[in-house]
């Protein structure tokens, strides 16, 4: 699963590098390399929250595509550079906010099956405490270890 990778191995990191490459062509802002390197080794990245991971990856990919198009239209244009630079900073800011939100939130207390409801059931006999009641009722095996669930 992509969420188990180190941040520098993710699609998001590659898209951020694409944005940085476009900005580096202008050679106007050496700080961008430092910004990207600062967050390069964020791992694990949004552990157990695949939904948010893919939403953020989609936003980042769309912005990277928009920058590719802008770069073709506004080559070596200072207005184009400023706009692309702002996109880059906005994306890094989104990344930081999301990471901080994950640290502050109770993301680890959400069901590993639906990612929506609070965990409230301890699975027997393995004792994994990872699912909500509605998901538990649909399961025959533990989503963590695949052992057969004793529902008595």
Swiss-Prot record:
It holds the Pfam family zf-C3HC4_3. A zinc finger (RING-type) spans 111-146. GO terms for molecular function: ubiquitin-protein transferase activity; zinc ion binding. The keyword Isomerase does not apply. SMART domains: RING. Keywords: Metal-binding, Zinc, Zinc-finger. The keyword Zinc-finger applies. Belongs to the IIV-6 157L family. This is Putative RING finger protein 157L. It comes from Invertebrate iridescent virus 6.
């Amino acid at each position: 699963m992509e969420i188990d990778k180190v941040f520098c191995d993710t699609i998001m990191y590659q898209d951020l590098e694409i944005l940085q490459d476009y900005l580096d062509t202008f050679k106007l802002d050496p700080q961008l390399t430092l910004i990207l390197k600062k967050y390069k080794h964020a791992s694990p990245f949004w552990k157990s929250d695949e939904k948010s991971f893919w939403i953020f990856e989609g936003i980042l990919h769309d912005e990277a595509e928009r920058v590719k198009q802008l770069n073709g239209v506004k080559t070596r244009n200072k207005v184009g550079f400023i706009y692309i630079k702002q996109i880059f900073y906005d994306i890094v800011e989104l990344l930081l906010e999301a990471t901080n939100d994950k640290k502050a939130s109770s993301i680890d207390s959400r069901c590993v099956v639906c990612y929506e409801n609070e965990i409230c059931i301890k699975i027997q006999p393995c004792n994994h405490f990872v699912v909500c009641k509605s998901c538990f009722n649909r399961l025959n095996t533990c989503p963590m270890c695949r052992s057969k669930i004793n529902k008595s």
